[in-house]
Amino acid sequence: MSALTYRERPADGAPEGLLILHHGRGSDEHDLLTLADVLDPTHRLHVVTPRAPLELPDSPGYHWYLVPRVGYPDPDSFDAARHQLGELHDELWQRTGVKPERTMLGGFSMGAVMSYVMAFSAERPAPAGVLAFSGFIASVEQWQPDLANRTAVRVFIAHGKRDQVIGVEFARAAAKRLREAGLPVEYHESEAGHHIDPREIPAASAWLTDTLERSRLTARAKSPGAGP
């Protein structure tokens, strides 16, 4: 059983997919539950929001890894979080019956970083898509994103030009790197700072719906006896 605490928002009826939302630094598992209702208002998805494993000193919030400098997570705490999330994701797939290819990983700030990590680690199953608000692809010793084998993973990136915590150049670099590797990327910039811009939510929700539908069609095409 996973050591991570988490919250769940069940789908209405049998889930058509799984959405795992990872919060940012200084927050907890409650933070993105409201985002789930906006992204998936018809409750087609089973939603899970994990709590990061590390407590912040003198703060009620949590974080995923230590930060020597932006863009370069501490390798030990980063690796520990990656393995703990892997255990949770595996547990969720088994319990819900939803497969990785029907799963979307999303998050804000550090949570976006962890979504990239879990989607692009070579030893992990590839999800249907990644929803990254104000994040980056981490540079960490002994970890490299496996992009060559993930070209079917769809990516939505939204970042504020006025972000003073994680500069927009990180998002631009991620989009460029992913596109050059052949991944389909939908990229949005706004005048926002370091937060999820509400103006980007309609596009993110539409992307989520489209990604879910594409994953359904792909699964149908791969199933035995599928028609033309």
PLM regions and their residue ranges:
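Active-site signature of alpha/beta-hydrolase-fold catalytic machinery across serine-
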Residues: T34, V117-S121
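Conserved alpha/beta-hydrolase "nucleophile elbow" surrounding the catalytic nucleophile
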Residues: H23-R25, T103-F108, G160
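Gly/Ala-rich beta-loop-alpha elbow adjacent to hydrolase catalytic centers
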Residues: G107-G111, S115
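Short beta-strand/loop motif that positions the catalytic acidic residue
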Residues: I157-H159, D163
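Serine-hydrolase catalytic machinery in alpha/beta-hydrolase-like enzymes
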Residues: M1-P100
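Short alpha-helix in the alpha/beta-hydrolase fold that links the catalytic acid
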Residues: L32-L35, W143-Q144, G167-R177
